[in-house]
Amino acid sequence: MKRLPMRLFVGLMIVGLSCHAADVDTSHFAARQVRVDGHSYAYRVFLPAGWDSKRNWPIVLFLHGSGERGSDNRASLSQGLPPWLKDHAADFPAVVVIPQAPQDTYWYGTPEKMALAALQDSIEAFHGDRNRLYLTGLSMGGYGVWQIAADHPGMFAAVAVVCGGLLPPSDSPELHLQGVPVGKNPYAWLAHRITPLPAWIFHGAADDIVSPQGSRDMYAALQAQGDDVRYTEFPGVNHGSWVPAYATPELWPWMFSHRRDHQR
């Protein structure tokens, strides 16, 4: 387990947390729509510089947190990976799909179907490589990463989970991993279900919204499976650990080194 110093992340986190949807720069993110169960849902997609249709491209599916839910197709760009992408648009090598969950929903049920429909739409429209599909999310979206990985084992080449969990936080009893059999340890069950999926887990040591203990327990369960798993905990960082997480220099080389067809 890695523990990183806070360095400049406190100031960056304050800036990130103060962002409002109305202030979001959408210039790097094209708007698209998908239909699920008779309803239209908007999502955003980032295309790397130099994208063309002559080859297939890796695709990252990003799941936002609870504060970015809605239907404006803008708030989903305000935290986490999208702001980081804006500053690294020139050299990020993958397509990024950014769905938006409706208010008062979580990343299971219809929002999960919608996110995967947006991913499928982007695979077809932007020549996605099905052996290089990646999944990441923060907070509620971190829960969503584990949910989608559990519901669709073998779909993704690697995942990155930021301040997520499996058990519900005190203020959101509906937010938890769905489908765990009664009486089963959720961490051991999930680790066995998704193996050998490579995972990098991030959490703030001072997080008082989603306890880091769940990430520690998931890390231990994946280690017990012998999987390629990393855990980075940021000392002194509260819930906004997505700022240092997505700025971790080794994250993207590690993620893109994995292919689904190379998993054991």
PLM region spans:
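A domain-start/cap signature at the N-terminus of enzymes
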Residues: 19-59, 136-138, 180-182, 216-220, ...
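Structural recognition of the beta-strand scaffold that forms the well-ordered cores
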Residues: 44, 59-63, 95-100, 132-136, ...
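Gly/Ser-rich "nucleophile elbow"/oxyanion-hole loop immediately N-terminal to the catalytic nucleophile
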Residues: 50-55, 104-140, 153
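Active-site machinery of serine-nucleophile hydrolases
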Residues: 59, 63-118
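Hydrolases whose catalytic domains are alpha/beta-hydrolase-1, hotdog thioesterase
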Residues: 144-148
